[in-house]
């Protein structure tokens, strides 16, 4: 091995080692967080914050089926007790007043800071007279015993009014002391995990703990609980299921694709050495691309990795071109000197391969401009992988090939393929009609071609979605995504903004436009409001004087309310309420779901809206009513679809820009608009026919179909460029034609298995690229010029 050869191989090994080290240290994930935008608008920012850190992403809906109602209730109680003691869970509710004591103690201790009724008028003699009279009247009711002990310290009923105001409007029915479904056949629990929605590892660990805890409690109850089973749903369940499905699918299709490609290469080469050498560009491309994405983005998405492993089908093309095109042209031709043949290939064919590679890179470079990291990842992976594979083919493989190694004679196959090409040329008119019919179909169905629903990309099966909907309805967990959001630089700022919105929202409730609303300021009033409420509390002398007047005509003496006077004086000088004071109460959980701090230090207050009975919320009228308040009205479901629609529009625009970039590069390289049109026409025809075929099969196109179309153009550009080269050199040679067909089969073998993945996004890619690449070759051959002098 001469110095030049040694330097090239050593440099490649060193770079591959570095890339492998970076790839092994890369963080891999299968959640969809990288498919959230870098710079969302106001509504999308609320959605993104909720998906990443909001309470909605941490909810687990739990049901216990089987056994008897009593056993289910016992299991529910024991499971809730066990889970509350574990660090994985922030809250566990099952209908028992497990936090009733903490909630009551907190509300009682801070009742005058929490109550919206705390103002100077509330402590006038007239107001006190009415309040005390109402409290005395309630002593005859079912809660009279409890109220009797509370009356001396809280004669105005501030504590119970506050607790009543924060009580959820509807809760599941109780059976044997715990929540149960309406038919009583299922015990229900609502569990909140501590881990954020994007920490799927922690969410999965919490689910394992939950299921293990249930199994232990069921075993502890013995035979009576043997028939009990656990049902769990919620975002964490969907996220962990999706990750598992994607990971298994990526592994499955990668192995199948690799096996098909290896089988194809063995069929072509009939040489283990050539097979191993031919895989080097592929493996280098995958390793270098994975390392580049890991370094550039900090995390490698499972979807990107699945896409990348399928890219083996295109990356293997380069070695096929080298090995086949540098082989003997026919039985009469003596086996060429191996090194001379490879140098001749570099001189004759590398410019065409290089132009095809650059064309592919230009197309995918447009995706880097997307502010959606997932789309940019796919673009970066494709660019780096194709570039690395091509460079290894150009510089490394010729140095590694043994001097006497040559590919078997493929001239017979090439000659048969030549006859096929001539037959395809005779079918130009029918193929043109096929393209026109496909274009007409797409034009006629233009309003139904694209599926702009985010759910279309979900791998979650319908039975899981149905089970979630059933649990959600049984437990009364609202699936309404309507809320009002205000953002600010501090917690105090957003709490004040939430308080300012309350009068407008109460007006909407009175008008019947909404059924109600919640607010973080209900559980933690702003400091400004708390100080105002403290300032409204009277001193002892004044309060005692008002009480003496207030009790006139009532069957009670003013002296009985000395605890009331003492507590009011204590509240006047007590420290203001903070988030830390709410710990160990259900108020903390409610507050944390509505008061969010983002990763940049900003704050958001969310005010969930409840729909009026029997009708949805008219969000347009709500927006009109809140105009000028600085608040935004968000429909999370609609916003998620709008986010995907924006994603899709961005991808379409960038793809068109990529095609224009390809055309510009080809024009610069070929210096002929006619030749550029001849190169691009078969690729665009293939895309049109594939898209129409998918629509005819009842599919609506999604984001990954679009990325697949880009891949069809990228892979097909090599075919079209070789046919263009053949026209300028008297026709395409049989071995070149054979190399194109085998390269095409490699692409089909790489992407075809994606159809079997069971993951919509991967299946969409396979359904586009596999037939699209085949059609790109067919159209390139059909539109190639007739031979006019024989190949050279």
Language-model-detected regions and their locations in the chain:
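Signature of alpha-helical transmembrane segments and their immediate interfacial
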Residues: 1-30, 398-399, 403-453
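Alpha-helical transmembrane helix bundles of large polytopic membrane transport and channel proteins
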Residues: 20-21, 34, 74-187, 202, ...
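Solvent-exposed, non-transmembrane loop/terminal regulatory segments of multi-pass membrane proteins
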Residues: 22-67, 166-178, 423, 427, ...
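Extracytoplasmic
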Residues: 144-267, 271, 570-663
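Hydrophobic transmembrane alpha-helices and their membrane-interface caps
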Residues: 274-321, 675-722, 752
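Pore- and gate-forming transmembrane helices of large, multi-pass membrane proteins
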Residues: 279, 331-370, 729-757
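Transmembrane alpha-helices and their membrane-interface boundaries in multi-pass membrane transporters
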Residues: 295, 311-327, 350, 354-412, ...
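Juxtamembrane segments of multi-pass membrane proteins
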Residues: 428-551
